[in-house]
UniProtKB/Swiss-Prot annotation:
InterPro entries: Ribosomal_bL35 (IPR001706), Ribosomal_bL35-like (IPR021137), Ribosomal_bL35_CS (IPR018265), Ribosomal_bL35_sf (IPR037229). Belongs to the bacterial ribosomal protein bL35 family. GO terms for molecular function: structural constituent of ribosome. This is Large ribosomal subunit protein bL35.
Amino acid sequence: MPKMKTNRGAAKRFKLKKNAIKRGSAFKNHILTKKSHQRKANLNAPKYVHSTNVDSVKSLLCMA
């Protein structure tokens, strides 16, 4: 049986941490002038994959 291949798009978007899978934040790339300082600060906070999606993300990363 051949080796499992990691989904390269998922590998660039998710980081596996000790207790969770870290992900990026949406709405933080462009058109930032109309967004308030508070909203942009909240978008900078770390985000983690929801528990219902952890298994599917792990399978993309060949961790399951």
